[in-house]
Regions:
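Conserved HAMP-HisKA connector
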Residues: 1-23, 32
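Core catalytic ATP-binding domain of two-component histidine kinases
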Residues: 29, 33, 40, 46-169
């Protein structure tokens, strides 16, 4: 019963997140576009130009975060497909580095393995693994991908791993 409730809660959270991201993205496009047009009308070096340039840069950064989160949420609807775990790990690193402050920490991947799994499940597992590793990180977090006994394994520096059934060759 508790698993069913948790599943419904997560599904509701996903729907709300998708809707919120959409509602944020639309006015953000107008904000960034208006700032870009205004920059062309202002003299460089003026306070007004600098303020509008800051608005444009900040809006662009927020738009990148929104796009990354939208992509992550969209993955949740995909069924199983053939995936490179290294590519999925790189995508997870891209998302985490956009939305979580990771100052002084380098995120890297090494190795590769292929799995057949829903990309949303793989992405969620890898983001969770990264977040756990970042809690104790001191310098570098590496996601090492390898095949081990019929499984594709992703190991995080400092502990933690996720296992997926390796795809048949």
């Amino acid at each position: 019963m508790e698993d069913t409730h948790r599943s419904r809660t997560l599904q509701t959270l996903g729907l709300l997140t998708r809707g919120a991201l959409h509602q944020i993205a639309n006015p953000l496009v107008a904000l960034v576009g208006s700032a870009e047009l205004a920059l062309g009308e202002l003299d460089p070096g003026t306070k007004a130009h600098d303020r509008v340039a800051l608005t444009h840069r900040t809006g662009t950064e927020i738009a990148e975060i929104v796009r990354a989160l939208q992509g992550f949420v969209r993955l949740q609807a995909h069924g199983p497909e053939r995936l490179s775990l290294s590519a999925a790990a790189t995508d997870a690193i891209g998302l985490v580095s956009k939305v979580i402050p990771i100052h002084g920490v380098t995120l890297t991947t090494s190795g590769d393995a292929t799995v057949v799994a829903p990309p949303g499940d793989v992405g969620s597992d890898l983001v969770e693994l990264l977040v756990e590793a970042l809690e104790t990180a001191d310098g570098t977090v590496e996601l090492a991908v390898r095949e081990e006994g019929g499984d594709a394994v992703v190991l995080a520096t400092g502990g933690g791993e996720r296992r997926f059934p390796a795809a048949a060759a």
